[in-house]
Amino acid sequence: MEMAFATQDDVFAVLEDVLPPIFAKYGKYNIASEAPFRRISYRDAMETYGSDKPDLRIDLTVQDMTALVAGSEFAPFAAGNTVKAVVVPDCAMARKAIDKLCADVEVQAGSKPYWFKVDEQGSFAGGIAKFLTDKTAEITAALGLKPGCFVGVTAGKKTAAQKTAGVLRTKLGTAVPGHMDAE
């Protein structure tokens, strides 16, 4: 498609007319995108999904927990670093699967993710839980945690933490059943 002096809105207007019928006719999904297409600013996409091109089929989001872990003894949470979390409710992943997923995220994003689970009593267990024991109530309330939740955590400079959280969100969304709309 070629357009002279087109604005972003001009391009969207044309594509919103052209693409839905094509998606409906040739797409492999029963649900076609409808106009107007959802528009997400770069800042919102990075803060909410950890990516400037998020997979919106995944229902997981990225949450900021920088203020919640301020003053923690865990070195990656040191002052100046941004800390992001991806909460997965009712996650029954085994330790081996979690370790593999974290290794895959580290290879793809270049930064190591951390994790902990919420046990049946509401306490944190596994991964970095021992560094968060004094802030359990605050973190539980702020992130809306319930027993059975898995929390993937990333830390680093803002863009690195966001990027790693985005990769973690995508990997968790595809690995944990019920969080990716395949339709």
Q: Model-flagged regions — what are they?
A:
Residues 2-183:
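Class II aminoacyl-tRNA synthetase catalytic cores and aaRS-like
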